C-alpha cells in the first residue's frame, strides 16, 4: 500500500535517473546492460541507480503492466464508497476490498465519499456481482458507481519524468 507523500518525502532524482526511468518506461525489456550501452554509462552505475530508485520507492515495480481487458475483464468502473466511521479507520474496509480480485485500486479521498476504488468485470452482470461483493461489508454504508465507457488517457508517468528531466537540467 502506498500513501500520498508530501514534497519533503521526495527522493532526489537527477538527470541520469530520469534518463534511466524514461528508457525503462519506453523500452521495458531493455535490461541493465542494454540501458548502460544506450546511455553510455557503466552497467554497475545503471544497476546501482536502479537499486536506489527501488529502495527509495521511486521505482515501485519492474513487473509487467497487464491490461485487464486483454485477459477477459473489459468493463471498468469507479466506485465511491462511504464508510461507517469508527475505530480502525478504513483498515477493515481495505482488508475486505483486498480480498476481491477485481478491485484494482483503492484510494482514501476527500469530498463526498471516503474511498474511491477502480474495479473490473467480465461484463455488466459480472460487474454487478463485483459491486455486490464490495458493498457486502458492514462498514460500507453507501456506494456510487460510474462505468468507464473508454479510457482516453491511461495511467502515465512518461510526461512527468520528461518534465522532471527538462526542469532538472
Map each language-model feature to its residues:
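A compositional/biophysical signature of low hydrophobicity enriched in polar/charged and small residues
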Residues: 1-169
Amino acid at each position: 500500500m502506498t500513501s500520498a507523500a508530501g514534497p519533503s518525502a521526495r527522493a532526489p532524482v537527477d538527470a541520469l535517473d530520469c534518463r534511466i526511468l524514461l528508457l525503462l518506461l519506453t523500452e521495458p525489456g531493455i535490461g541493465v546492460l542494454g540501458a548502460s550501452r544506450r546511455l553510455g554509462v557503466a552497467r554497475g552505475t545503471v544497476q546501482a541507480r536502479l537499486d536506489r530508485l527501488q529502495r527509495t520507492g521511486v521505482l515501485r515495480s519492474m513487473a509487467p503492466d497487464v491490461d485487464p481487458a486483454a485477459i477477459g475483464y473489459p468493463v471498468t468502473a469507479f466506485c465511491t464508497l462511504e464508510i461507517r466511521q469508527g475505530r480502525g479507520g478504513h483498515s477493515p474496509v481495505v482488508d475486505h476490498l483486498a480480498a476481491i480480485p477485481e478491485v484494482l485500486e483503492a484510494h482514501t479521498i476527500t469530498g463526498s465519499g471516503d474511498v474511491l476504488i477502480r474495479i473490473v468485470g467480465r461484463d455488466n452482470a459480472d460487474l454487478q456481482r463485483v459491486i455486490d461483493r464490495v458493498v457486502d461489508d458492514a462498514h460500507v454504508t453507501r456506494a456510487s458507481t460510474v462505468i468507464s465507457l473508454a479510457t482516453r488517457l491511461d495511467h502515465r508517468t512518461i510526461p512527468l519524468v520528461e518534465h522532471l528531466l527538462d526542469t532538472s537540467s
